[in-house]
Design a protein with these regions (language model features):
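His/Met- and acidic-residue-enriched segments that coordinate or traffic transition-metal cofactors
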Residues: 2-11, 15-170
């Protein structure tokens, strides 16, 4: 009888462990979620600066859309991370803090150029690539679905960034 209880207990423990592990995404998926959170926070904070300090109306309009879109992405990301038990970083991270500090020291046209250098086409292309890779390769189906859902939004961000940068050169 005791052997049977032990066997049942071990079987239940193994099933419970498998369930717990199934709920947590693969390390690469968790890393994607964390990196997306850091990058999103940078996009929000740099774009909020651009709304305040930007000189060109095209830049301000781009920045406002980036804030709105990235807030929606952030909300979906936070919900997914909570469901997957992934702790997301708070704020944009050390590397992004330095860029934000440097950016906030700029004024007028110099600010607009610096903002587009930091949050413009190159940055948006990198984000798009990151999400495309997760959309194709994430092990967790929910992480993959999230990335797939956001790819069109990030494609639009990249297109707008290219258009805004081009408008500054005119």
């Amino acid at each position: 009888m005791n052997a049977r209880r032990i066997a049942l207990s071990l079987g239940a423990a193994i099933c419970l462990t498998a369930t717990v592990h199934a709920a947590a995404p693969a390390a690469a998926d968790a890393a994607f979620l964390k990196e997306a959170a850091l990058d999103g926070q940078f996009d929000i904070q740099s774009s909020r600066l651009a709304e305040r300090l930007g000189h060109n109306e095209v830049v301000k309009k781009y920045a406002a859309q980036m804030v709105d879109d990235n807030r929606r992405i952030e909300n979906a990301l936070k919900k997914l991370a909570m469901d997957k038990k992934v702790d997301l970083p708070v704020g944009p991270g050390d590397a992004h803090h330095a860029a934000l500090k440097k950016l906030s020291a700029q004024k007028g046209d110099a600010f607009d150029r610096a903002y587009m250098e930091q949050a413009g086409p190159k940055r948006q292309a990198a984000s798009l690539k990151q999400f495309q890779q997760a959309a194709a390769n994430a092990k967790d189906k929910d992480v993959r679905a999230f990335a797939q859902e956001m790819v069109p939004v990030l494609t639009d961000h990249h297109t707008r960034a290219v258009e805004t940068a081009a408008a500054l050169k005119k």
